[in-house]
Amino acid sequence: MRKVVLYIATSMDGYIAKPNDDLSFLSIVQKEGEDYGYKDFIDTVDTVILGRKTYDWIVKQVAFPHADKHAYIITRTKRPDEGKTVFYSGNLKDLINKLKKEHGKNIFCDGGAEIVNELLKDNLIDEFIISVIPVLLGNGTKLFNDDRPETKLDFVSAKSFDTGLVQLHYKRKV
């Protein structure tokens, strides 16, 4: 069965964005030639799940980087699909359960926080690869909401980089 893998960056104090969906803090760890394992990770997935706000932010910056994969943009407002990119307004749990049963590579959850926390409520995230950025933001969008079930994890690995980024990899205990 395919796995849902959350691959995301967060500040030391648990925020994935500053107020107004500002992701500028990510530039703290930008280093030429360093992708923090992203290319290796992205080769293991063929499907991407992300929220509409995250999608809109990405396409304002660059061309959608996942156009070659099956992408499901979770939205409350139906929009026309664009190639392999589907704007999905149905039940998220049903979609994930359907995708997990299909043949293919893993499923990349790219955020945002609403999608992550909805998936956590139903124990639908199998692995967590979280890159911790060395900054305390103080406010913004929290990665994990307070009102969610406890989720026990098994340690897979931890990597540290000279930029100060630490990448943590865990699997959900079954």
Can you annotate each of these PLM segments?
Residues 1-174:
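Enzymes that bind and transform nitrogen-containing heteroaromatic metabolites
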